[in-house]
Curated annotation (Swiss-Prot):
Binds 3 Mg(2+) or Mn(2+) ions per subunit. Belongs to the terpene synthase family. Tpsb subfamily. A motif (DDXXD motif) lies at residues 367-371. The lineage of its organism: Eukaryota, Viridiplantae, Streptophyta, Embryophyta, Tracheophyta. Trichome. The Asp-Asp-Xaa-Xaa-Asp/Glu (DDXXD/E) motif is important for the catalytic activity, presumably through binding to Mg(2+). It is an enzyme of class 4 (lyase). Mg(2+) 1 binds at residues 367, 371. This is (+)-alpha-pinene synthase TPS2, chloroplastic. Mg(2+) 2 binds at residues 367, 371. It catalyses: (2E)-geranyl diphosphate = (1R,5R)-alpha-pinene + diphosphate; (2E)-geranyl diphosphate = (1R,5R)-beta-pinene + diphosphate; (2E)-geranyl diphosphate = (4S)-limonene + diphosphate; (2E)-geranyl diphosphate = beta-myrcene + diphosphate. Optimum temperature is 30 degrees Celsius. Involved in monoterpene (C10) olefins biosynthesis, constituants of cannabinoids and terpenoids-rich resins. Catalyzes mainly the conversion of (2E)-geranyl diphosphate to (+)-alpha-pinene, and also produces minor products such as (-)-limonene, (+)-beta-pinene and beta-myrcene.
Amino acid sequence: MHCMAVRHFAPSSSLSIFSSTNINNHFFGREIFTPKTSNITTKKSRSRPNCNPIQCSLAKSPSSDTSTIVRRSANYDPPIWSFDFIQSLPCKYKGEPYTSRSNKLKEEVKKMLVGMENSLVQLELIDTLQRLGISYHFENEIISILKEYFTNISTNKNPKYDLYATALEFRLLREYGYAIPQEIFNDFKDETGKFKASIKNDDIKGVLALYEASFYVKNGENILEEARVFTTEYLKRYVMMIDQNIILNDNMAILVRHALEMPLHWRTIRAEAKWFIEEYEKTQDKNGTLLEFAKLDFNMLQSIFQEDLKHVSRWWEHSELGKNKMVYARDRLVEAFLWQVGVRFEPQFSHFRRISARIYALITIIDDIYDVYGTLEELELFTKAVERWDAKTIHELPDYMKLPFFTLFNTVNEMAYDVLEEHNFVTVEYLKNSWAELCRCYLEEAKWFYSGYKPTLKKYIENASLSIGGQIIFVYAFFSLTKSITNEALESLQEGHHAACRQGSLMLRLADDLGTLSDEMKRGDVPKSIQCYMHDTGASEDEAREHIKFLISEIWKEMNDEDEYNSIFSKEFVQACKNLGRMSLFMYQHGDGHASQDSHSRKRISDLIINPIPL
């Protein structure tokens, strides 16, 4: 037998996810918040880490008498997606004959793509493949094609394009990591340095393309900033003229309205694919092969999602968290799974979706314990139990906390063992410290609530950017999506040096605040970023909301600076960080898409997970 060396990832005393970046200056300068850490030591081991499952005792703890405690309630509705319903999902589009047909269509599309040499039609096809949600099948071909375009630009061999073609080429090159300069748009400016007024007269297609390209702006890129203002103003006037019946409400009008609602760069891939497939089918110049492949691929992916969800649902049922025992908390397993579909949808990432959905569901339960149900004394007990990470501490907890702690303890240890088997890294200390830090941030907010403290926006963001839980999602994403783990990447993740992680979490926090403010204020909660800004500046709620939206756009500049194709992290991981930001905008676009089970929430889940597209 060969001895296998085990490497240990020793955590730092805290996870400073938000180190100094440009975006922090918009909040409060460069001072960084680091919660106090527990006295947990890292023990190295050459055997299996301390991952023994614990048995949940039914004996009452000394603190379990809650008969005289008046507790808050969020009155969460039970889940509308039952265990039996989830297990009955057909997963129809698996195996033959679908696999053979898909492979044949894929080859036809591939020939179509590579056969168009250096032409605008080729760029338009890449754009269409992206919006139909099937470009991931041709990643290598697209990168090779765009490399040639970038080389032509760098050597001044590129043809003289109009605004539409230039903007489309720019957006695609930026998306795939090519450093195409913003100055390429100077050709469309007049002698005063402003975009030519003539552009707006007869080139709505070009203006829309420039609008979409402008959202790839990085810090200091004034030309793209000007382009966004210029195009947004014009497109809004264009829609106004449509509403007044001055302009025909055609396919272009549909695309313009869609873009103004949210730019393509900010949208989540699967939701955009569902929408665009339906719109593309209505067009007269649609390509039948592309449409059939997009529909079939959507349905085949959906069958994989259904299998993944069934797996997670069985775990949830076995844990007993989904048996109406957590009446004070949100049972939103399907919504938790939907997040993971948006973060990484590709078929090879089933393991990631299954693991991360568990984590998101646990975050939801524990968040509600701290936000709604627990007393301050009980929350301090739970925090200490997570910090100690000792099975014996379960007997010190109130009865209602035992099952969540039991599930958390076993789930984290199980996942740590999986990482040990897969990557030969002992990570249990790091994983449990991540959860301990999250609970400390939750506890800090609970103290604010019980004391009536109103934090400044600075202080709120320092804590809330961590309490949103994004850093824990990224920890599990890192180990689930990374094939070859390096010490450099581990140290960067540990110290919070990676922009995509920081900004993905921060965007999640701010989008959550925009979508959940009304409901959380009704039940009683700490002030969110909107109220903090209002309190700091005297702004109205509308003004505060606009400021938070501005901060989100500034966060995107930081994320655009992060080149996923030249990073110490895997491309798959960096894309996951950015996609979490996209999913936060998607889930909170029409309110609280995670907790609420309104028509928007049901439609999202039905469209992406439940109902296939008719072929």
